[in-house]
Amino acid sequence: MHLYFYCLILLFVPGGNSLGINSYLKHMSNKPQDHVNRTKTVDSKDLAALPLSSYMLNLYQSFHHSELNHGTEGAPSLPSNHRADIIRSLAAKSFDHGGSRWTLVFDFSSLSQEEEHQLAEVRFDFRAFEGAISAEMEVMVDFLHQSSSCQSISGWCQSYLYVGSLTGTLRSRSSDTWVTFEATDIIHKWFERNEKGKSRYEDREKQLKKLPRAKSAERRYQQQNTEDQQIVMMVYSNISKKERLSGTATLLQDAAHSKYLVVMPGIQTIAHTRRHRRSHIFKEHVMGMKHVPPADSSRTLCRRVDFFVDFKQIGWDSWIIHPMKYNAYRCEGECPSPVNESVKPNNHAYMQSLLNYYVKGKAPEVCCVPIRMSSLSMVYYDHDDIAFQNHEGMIVEECGCQ
C-alpha cells in the first residue's frame, strides 16, 4: 500500500517541486492529527461555514464610515499603494508546514480571468503560528488547488492540483497581527494553466484515499478557527476596461453569478444551473419583481425622496453579508415646462424642454432622474469565498430634470 501511494505522488507533481508536496501528502496519510483541513460542502443553508475574517470586516467598516461622512470616493487601497475595485478573501482549505516549507491548499475557482489582477498575498495569523513563523523569515510555499465542487459522500475530497511554488520573505506591518507573503505569480500561473488547457495537467490530479480519522481532524480545525481564518489569500483586482466602458451594473453581475441567490416565489428556475446560464435566470427574477409605486404628489417639483432597500425582501440576504439594509433614495416629482435652474437641467434637457414648450409633441418631456450618484461598499459571498467591492451608482445623491 505504501509503495503504491508513493508512486502516485511521483505522478502527481513532476520535477524538483515534488519533494515538499510529497511530504505533505505522505504526512496527510500518516499523521492526520497534525494536518488541518476544512473541506466541506457549503450551501446557502450553512453560510456560517464561511466566517467573515476580521480583515474583511475592518475593510468594510472603514469604507462604510467614509461613506457616512461623505469621504472621498474611491476603490480600496492595496498594501503597495495601488488601487483595486474588488478584494477577494480565499481561506486556505488545508495546510501543512515543516520548518520553512509550507504547503497551502486553496480553491481558485472563483477568480475571474476577465479581471485585472493587481496583487495577491497570503496572510498568516501570527497568533496561531507563533514560534513557527516570524517577520523577515525566508519560506518556500507550495500551492495546490482543490475545488469545492469536489465532494465525497462524507463531504471530504482528496483531489488536488499542483499550481506552483514560490520562495520569498514573510513581511509584517505595524500594529498588525498578520505576516504576509506575496503570491501574485501564483494567480498568473493559475490562469496560464487554464489558457494552455486542462488536458495537459490531468496527470497531476489524482484521487487520494480517504484520510484516516478525518472527523477528528475536522473537529480540531474548528476548535482552532473559532474567531478567524488562520491563513487567507487576499486577491486584489480591477474590473476590465471593457466592462468599465460598457457601463453594466456590477451588482447585477455579482448577483447573477451568486450560487447563494434565493429566487423568490413565482419565479421559475432550473436546479443545478451552470454559471453561464445564471445571468438569464437572474434577468427573469428582476423582471418578476414589482416596481415600487411613486408617492402621491400634486405637482410637486422634482426632488430626492427616501427609498429604503431591504435585501431580505428580494431574497438577497442569502449572499449579501453587509449591509443588509440601506437608503438608496430615488427621484420623484414633476419637471416644469420649460425647465429652469432649480431642477438642474443640462443644456440638452433645456433645449428639449424649450422646443417642446413652443412646439408640442416635438420631443418627449424631460424626466425627473438621478443626476449624481454615489457608491456603496458591500461584503458578500462569492462562490465559496468572501469578497469586498465598492459598487458605484448605488445611492442617489441629487435629482434633476433631464
Swiss-Prot record:
Homodimer; disulfide-linked. Residues 1-18 form the signal peptide. Glycans are attached at N37, N238, N340. Gene3D superfamilies: Cystine-knot cytokines (2.10.90.10). GO terms for cellular component: extracellular space. The keyword rRNA processing does not apply. This is Nodal homolog 4-A. Induction: By dorsal-mesoderm inducing signals including vegt and other nodal-related proteins. By sox17. Cooperation and regulatory loops of multiple nodals are essential for mesendoderm patterning in early embryos. Plays a role in mesoderm formation and may be required for neural development. GO terms for biological process: dorsal/ventral axis specification. Transmembrane segments: none annotated. InterPro entries: Cystine-knot_cytokine, TGF-b_C, TGF-beta-rel, TGFb_CS. The keyword Secreted applies. Keywords: Cleavage on pair of basic residues, Developmental protein, Disulfide bond, Glycoprotein, Growth factor, Secreted, Signal. Belongs to the TGF-beta family.
